[in-house]
Amino acid sequence: MTNKIQQFTSTGSKLLFHPDFIDSVRQTNLLLPISIQLAPTSICNLSCSFCSNRNRQMNESLLFDAVKFVLDTYNDLGAKTVEITGGGEPTLYHAINETITYANAKGYQVGLITNGTGFGRLSKETIQMLKWVRISMNVLDYRDGIDIPKLPKALTLGFSYVMNADTRMDEIKITLDRYIKEHKPAYVRIVSDCRTDWKTQQKNNQMLGALIKEWGSPYFYQPKEFHKPNECWWCYVKPFILHDSFVYPCSSIVLNSGSEERFHEKFRWMKIDEIPMAYSGMKQAPFNSRNCDHCVFSAQNALVGSLMHPNGMEMFI
């Protein structure tokens, strides 16, 4: 993989690096998890204007026993990585150090998505256990600055920024460049505010894609394409576990037109304690995606769907 989109974002092409998964699906017609996303708390210390989960309950946090159950269960099913994310701001979770330590002890590679304000809540030992950290630099829209500690050389640091109504276009690159010079992130991902319609999103992708290309490395623009999937299988491969004790099919359901800018109940897949049943060996069914009109995982769903529905011509590549 040579380009930053392929390396540092969720793409269907990464499935090619999991031949054991592909072989298992071909032999059993059952999907098993590769990675999980865990949002342990809804608590946050920012109120970003573009937050796609802004209408959430603001005081929800998973019990640490529930987190351990999730990590144990998906580990037994073969999951290899966990992304700790929001929700809210994950470093505000009361058991964030214990969660990372437990996941590491189970053999997970652990990534952390944070607004960068809570590094002081992470122990030095915990930080050493992280594979990567991605900081949402939109914190600079609301704070004068953040303190990023010296991180282990083996840890991949990345920045992300959402272009939004509060963005000061004449200032943001200057500010980001200052942090890039000091902390040398592997990448700076730029995305648009996805709380919009398809036509506006296409315009944003075109305009911002051209702009960020001019900015050069380490910047890259990640276009988000909205689709309505025929079938949703991605839920089995990379499920999203939320602070309300439910599992959702993915992180993008908050973008759907009926989501009310939160993880709406209509998009719940199952309760946490029902996870084992979803992989129990019974015939799996896709998540009902009739209300998913802003899916950004269409490529992933298409690839997994082709494994679930072989047509007999797979050898003719």
For the regions a protein language model found, what residue spans apply to each?
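Generic structural signal for small/hydrophobic residues in well-ordered secondary structure
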Residues: 40, 44-45, 89, 159, ...
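Radical SAM enzyme [4Fe-4S]-AdoMet core and its adjacent flexible, acidic
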Residues: 1, 7-10, 39, 60-65, ...
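Short cysteine clusters
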Residues: 44, 48-51, 232-235, 250, ...
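Sequence-level motif detector for i,i+2 pairs with an aromatic at +2
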Residues: 31-33, 154, 290-292
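Conserved alpha-helical substructure of the radical SAM core
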Residues: 2-125, 129-132, 142-145, 302-308, ...
